[in-house]
């Protein structure tokens, strides 16, 4: 990846985080959360979502919607990843069990906050690909 690509992805990630933050405000009455917690915001800003989608979807990686990842599965919408992370109130020192690894994006976001993430995936090919991504 070129430096220009990395900068473009970084600016797209900043816009994605801002859009997710706006959705928190718009859904406050339904969720009880008017803003992302600082640790979830930092994790979303740091984890490179484009690494967790197939090459043909990378140009769409920072849009706030789910994307196909193969085997009939999708990577969750960034807002849903942020909201579900905030709702479990993760803290440093905790361990989290995630059921349904998918591409590994949610696990990567959680790993920025908690001490240990255990993730289980039913589809062997997705589990293998996610494990490879999460090792790098």
Predicted features along the sequence, with ranges:
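Class I SAM-dependent transferase core
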Residues: 2-97, 113, 128
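Conserved nucleotide-cofactor-binding alpha/beta core module
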Residues: 87-136
């Amino acid at each position: 990846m070129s430096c220009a690509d990395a900068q473009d992805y970084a600016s797209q990630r900043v816009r994605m985080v801002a859009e997710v933050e706006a959705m928190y405000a718009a859904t406050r009455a339904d969720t009880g959360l008017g803003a992302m917690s600082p640790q979830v915001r930092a994790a979303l800003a740091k984890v490179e979502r484009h690494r967790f989608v197939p090459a043909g979807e990378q140009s769409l990686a920072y849009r706030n919607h789910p994307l196909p990842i193969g085997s009939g599965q999708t990577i969750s919408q960034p807002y849903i990843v942020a909201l579900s992370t905030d709702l479990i109130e993760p803290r440093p020192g905790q361990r989290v069990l995630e059921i349904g690894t998918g591409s590994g994006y949610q696990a990567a976001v959680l790993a920025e906050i908690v001490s240990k993430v255990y993730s289980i995936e039913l589809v062997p090919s997705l589990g293998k690909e996610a494990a490879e991504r999460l090792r790098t």
